[in-house]
A protein has these predicted regions:
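Terminal leader/tail segments of proteins
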Residues: 1-78
Length: 78
């Protein structure tokens, strides 16, 4: 269904719509979603991902924040 949730080693999670990271959960921040509008389909994916979360508890963040969360697992590898 072109939706993937990635669980990171630090307990955070990143939600992807197609291949784009658009939402997730981070300790210290809580639930977050992108401030960028991609498409109506991606918006539906995000809304479905947060179906059981009060919208007042979701922080809107820029894409750089989400990418930095994705890079967490890559730090110290090699």
């Amino acid at each position: 269904s072109n939706q993937t949730e990635l669980s990171l080693n630090n307990g955070d999670s990143i939600f992807f719509s197609y291949e784009t990271p658009v939402a997730g959960f981070a300790s210290g921040v809580g639930h977050f979603k992108t401030s960028t509008w991609y498409s109506s389909t991606t918006s539906r994916h995000i809304n479905k991902y947060f179906k059981h979360i009060d919208s007042n508890n979701i922080t809107t963040v820029d894409d750089a924040f989400i990418v930095s969360r994705c890079n967490y697992d890559l730090q110290g590898v090699g």
